[in-house]
C-alpha cells in the first residue's frame, strides 16, 4: 500500500487523482553492464510521455546496485490506464528485451488520508 497525506484545510486538487494507481516494475540485468543499461534508459525515456502512454502522470527509474534489481515506478490516472499500458506495444517491447529478465509487476492504489481536524 502506498499512502499519502492531505491536509483537509487546504483546497488543492488532490481529489482529481482519487483513482490514481502506482505500477512498480522490477527486473534484473542479464549480460548487460550498468553503462549499457543507462544508455538503454536514456534511449527509452522520451517514450514515457502522456502523449505516448495515456493516463501516465509520471515515471521514475529505480535501481539497487547491491541486489542488482532495477525497474520503474509509474503513476497512472486510473486502473484502466495501467491495464492499457500493460497491453501496449511499448510495454511488450520492454519485457521482450533480451537483457532485462525476471520481471515482477505490482499495482497499488494510491491511498489518501484526510488529516483529522478538531
Segments from the language model and where they lie:
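A common structural junction motif
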Residues: 92-98
Amino acid at each position: 500500500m502506498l499512502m499519502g497525506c492531505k491536509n483537509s484545510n487546504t483546497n488543492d486538487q488532490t481529489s482529481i487523482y482519487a483513482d490514481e494507481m502506482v505500477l512498480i516494475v522490477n527486473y534484473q540485468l542479464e549480460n548487460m553492464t550498468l553503462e549499457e543499461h543507462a544508455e538503454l534508459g536514456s534511449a527509452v525515456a522520451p517514450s514515457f510521455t502522456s502523449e505516448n502512454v495515456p493516463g501516465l502522470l509520471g515515471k521514475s527509474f529505480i535501481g539497487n546496485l547491491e541486489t542488482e534489481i532495477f525497474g520503474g515506478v509509474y503513476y497512472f490516472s486510473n486502473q484502466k490506464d495501467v491495464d492499457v499500458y500493460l497491453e501496449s506495444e511499448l510495454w511488450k517491447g520492454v519485457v521482450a528485451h533480451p537483457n532485462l529478465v525476471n520481471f515482477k509487476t505490482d499495482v497499488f492504489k494510491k491511498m489518501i488520508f484526510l488529516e483529522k481536524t478538531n
